[in-house]
């Protein structure tokens, strides 16, 4: 984890504060080509996590990075700040399919700032441009510490350093971290810079003895705000997006994305707000709640907290051929308080309840039931009037239908009833008599509909599986003719199941998926089978 902490401290120290906006470009072998619109001063971060070697080269020759690679927990990053207007195409020498085109609008000429890449072994590789390196961090007292000198790669500081009160930084070329954080007092740390020089920042300028009070790029598409203690990152999320399908309707390109939101910090994330850079691009979302402005974790089911190294997945449809950039605002809390709660509750409750209840009730009830059940076994097949020769006590014994309640019902177990349930629209028929133990309900609604080529009717459906029973649903399978479907996994031709990242629906929980089908009206899911 030390390498991860160093990586994100590096982000905080060397982010270019000239940037008006920050974008993340996923620089993986399976990434689709992207076209972004920015302005001079915007920062582009090339983010790779597929384990392959990559570099970044610009069409105008101004950028040529070293080779970098990374993984999901230790990503490789190469950051560029835009300095001139025009169309700039970025490509990789190692993968012909990787490309990104940036349309840069006019603005004042400012320095181009690049950061080093991080390889999978956690080492730091300086980027190609070489000149005076500098960085400054804002400390809790409001002072700024500036380090200047030639870049070095052994992790120590090079050059001289100076500290001032609340004044600006010193040195030939300075770069001050621009970041936001969830500090304990609720304040947001910001800073600016006024350096006219070309600067190159690498991991070698980090001073482990003087950690910054803030640590993240809040306006980037991939990182939320966080705070740092010692050299550890507390509250930090990373986001990756994968395009699954796209189509064109009425000259608008619609693209389906699956998004992985991973907690790479040290604290559990209780809640998070994702703000799109352009809300008009969001056509539909699932698994998260979208109010037209931002996305949040749902409250109708248990979706949090997101513990360290855990990932939640959601999806959306974009009215564009490229993914939407999200600004993340996570809220974390220390999970040390829940310990005393479970210790008191279980100690007293089980001691009193089982000692008295089972002693009296089971001793009498089972004694009579088995004796009476064996005698009238042949009797239920014939009516009570056939037993003329039996005594009155014998006739009264089989008459109560106590035998019918426990015996026949369990023989047609609830798992059989649920497995053969073919009724799919809400509510799915519960299993025969023990329906409260294993019960799923499917709720479907049409989100949108259209006619393609004035002939083919299409509808977009949002379906939610709700566990209304008393035991978790361990599997849910169904058949669908959907042409596009998301948030479920395919098991065969037109057959699907719960996704591996949400394979069990807890009691009271639910799972939502979506699909697009060629039809004019909504119909039931077919071949539904579920078990608990």
UniProtKB/Swiss-Prot annotation:
SMART domains: CBM49. One of its GO terms (molecular function) is extracellular matrix structural constituent. Residues 397-408 are annotated as: 3 X 4 AA tandem repeats of T-[EP]-T-[PD]. GO terms for cellular component: extracellular matrix. Residues 339-378 are annotated as: 10 X 4 AA tandem repeats of T-[EP]-T-[EP]. It comes from the Eukaryota. Residues 113-225, 328-436 are annotated as: Disordered. Residues 329-426 have a biased composition (Low complexity). Sequence repeats lie at residues 339-342, 343-346, 347-350, 351-354, 355-358, 359-362, 363-366, 367-370, 371-374, 375-378, 397-400, 401-404, 405-408. GO terms for biological process: extracellular matrix organization; spore germination; sporulation resulting in formation of a cellular spore. Gene3D superfamilies: Cupredoxins - blue copper proteins. Keywords: Repeat, Sporulation. A shared internal Thr-Glu-Thr-Pro repeat defines a family of D.discoideum spore germination specific proteins. This is Spore germination protein 270-11. It comes from Dictyostelium discoideum (Social amoeba).
């Amino acid at each position: 984890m030390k390498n991860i902490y160093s990586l994100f401290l590096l982000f905080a120290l060397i982010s270019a504060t000239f940037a008006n906006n920050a974008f993340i470009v996923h620089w993986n072998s399976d990434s689709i080509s992207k076209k972004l619109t920015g302005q001079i001063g915007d920062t582009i971060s090339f983010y790779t996590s597929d384990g392959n070697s990559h570099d970044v080269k610009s069409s105008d020759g101004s950028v040529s990075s070293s080779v970098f690679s990374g993984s999901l927990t230790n990503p490789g990053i190469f950051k560029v700040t835009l300095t001139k207007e025009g169309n700039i195409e970025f490509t990789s020498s190692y993968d012909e399919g990787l490309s990104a085109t940036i349309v840069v609008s006019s603005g004042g000429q400012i320095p181009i700032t690049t950061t080093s890449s991080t390889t999978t072994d956690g080492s730091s590789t300086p980027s190609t441009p070489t000149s005076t390196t500098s960085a400054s961090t804002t400390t809790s007292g409001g002072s700024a510490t500036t380090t200047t000198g030639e870049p070095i790669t052994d992790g120590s500081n090079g050059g001289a350093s100076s500290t001032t009160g609340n004044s600006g930084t010193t040195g030939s070329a300075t770069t001050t971290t621009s970041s936001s954080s969830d500090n304990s007092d609720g304040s947001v740390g910001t800073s600016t810079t006024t350096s006219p020089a070309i600067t190159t920042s690498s991991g070698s300028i980090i001073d482990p003895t003087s950690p910054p009070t803030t640590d993240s790029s809040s306006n980037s598409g991939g990182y939320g705000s966080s705070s740092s203690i010692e050299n550890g990152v507390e509250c930090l999320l990373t986001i990756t997006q994968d395009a699954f399908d796209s189509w064109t309707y009425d000259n608008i390109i619609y693209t389906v994305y699956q998004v992985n939101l991973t907690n790479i910090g040290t604290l559990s994330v209780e809640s998070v707000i994702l703000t799109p850079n352009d809300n008009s691009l969001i056509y539909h979302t699932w698994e998260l709640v979208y109010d037209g402005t931002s996305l949040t974790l749902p409250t109708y089911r248990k979706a949090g907290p997101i513990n360290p190294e855990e990932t939640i997945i959601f999806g959306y449809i974009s009215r564009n051929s490229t993914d939407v950039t999200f600004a993340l605002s996570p809220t974390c809390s220390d999970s040390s308080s829940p310990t005393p709660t479970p210790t008191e509750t279980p100690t007293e409750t089980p001691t009193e309840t089982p000692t008295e209840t089972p002693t009296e009730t089971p001793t009498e009830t089972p004694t009579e039931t088995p004796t009476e059940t064996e005698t009238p076994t042949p009797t239920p097949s014939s009516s009570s009037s056939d037993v003329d020769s039996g005594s009155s006590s014998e006739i009264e014994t089989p008459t109560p239908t106590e035998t019918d309640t426990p015996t026949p019902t369990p023989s047609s177990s609830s798992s059989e009833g649920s497995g053969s349930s073919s009724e799919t629209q809400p509510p799915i028929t519960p299993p025969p008599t023990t329906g409260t133990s294993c019960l799923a309900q499917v709720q479907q609604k049409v989100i949108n509909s259209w006619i393609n080529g004035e002939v083919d009717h299409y509808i977009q459906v949002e379906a939610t599986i709700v566990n209304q029973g008393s035991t978790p649903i361990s599997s849910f399978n169904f058949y669908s003719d959907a042409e596009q479907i998301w948030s479920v996994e395919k098991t065969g031709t037109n057959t699907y199941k719960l996704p591996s990242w949400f394979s069990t629906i807890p009691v009271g929980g639910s799972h939502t998926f979506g699909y697009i089908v060629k039809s004019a009206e909504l119909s039931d899911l077919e071949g539904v089978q579920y078990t608990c």
